[in-house]
From Swiss-Prot:
Heterotetramer of TRAP-alpha, TRAP-beta, TRAP-delta and TRAP-gamma. This is Translocon-associated protein subunit delta. Residues 1-23 form the signal peptide. TRAP proteins are part of a complex whose function is to bind calcium to the ER membrane and thereby regulate the retention of ER resident proteins. Residues 166-173 are cytoplasmic. Belongs to the TRAP-delta family. Residues 24-144 are lumenal. It comes from Homo sapiens (Human). Disulfide bonds join C26-C57. It is found in: Endoplasmic reticulum membrane. GO terms for cellular component: endomembrane system; endoplasmic reticulum; extracellular exosome; Sec61 translocon complex. InterPro entries: TRAP-delta.
């Protein structure tokens, strides 16, 4: 009986140490961000934002779960094939995607659970510190020329027809 109790205590100790290792926080994160945003609204239906980061931690934590918050909306962050590479993406209607800087706040599992708890309790989520933040500069989307090429071609055609008809009338007169 005593052997079973000590074996159970050993298993509990092993499980608790494993859970502490897997949920280890990233200390002093160093990031290398890159991002892409849609610039042409003529050929797309929504503005897409893609943020890729390369993350290294001072304590060498790898493959941690990350979550992103953009303007109060949360998105899961996917891990890349390479160690320490992560990506998050989202899309907005062209009218909603204003030109300017978007702050993408990244959270680990612990701070993300605090964020979700604050949301459930209708508390201010801006007081929860992110693991790190990436600023995405979106310059807006180009909606094409003010006058479509078809209308411009038709107008030029009408002007040429008028000039040709006028010249013909002057020659025949």
């Amino acid at each position: 009986m005593a052997a079973m109790a000590s074996l159970g205590a050993l298993a509990l100790l092993l499980l608790s140490s494993l859970s502490r290792c897997s949920a280890e926080a990233c200390l002093e994160p160093q990031i290398t961000p890159s991002y892409y945003t849609t610039s042409d609204a003529v050929i797309s239906t929504e503005t897409v934002f893609i943020v890729e980061i390369s993350l290294t931690c001072k304590n060498r934590v790898q493959n941690m779960a990350l979550y992103a918050d953009v303007g109060g909306k949360q998105f899961p962050v996917t891990r890349g094939q390479d160690v320490g590479r992560y990506q998050v993406s989202w899309s907005l209607d062209h009218k909603s995607a204003h030109a300017g800087t978007y702050e993408v706040r990244f959270f680990d599992e612990e701070s993300y659970s605090l964020l979700r708890k604050a949301q459930r309790n209708n508390e201010d989520i801006s007081i929860i510190p992110p693991l790190f933040t990436v600023s995405v500069d979106h310059r807006g989307t180009w909606n094409g020329p003010w006058v479509s090429t078809e209308v411009l071609a038709a107008a030029i055609g009408l002007v040429i027809y008028y000039l040709a008809f006028s010249a013909k009338s002057h020659i025949q007169a």
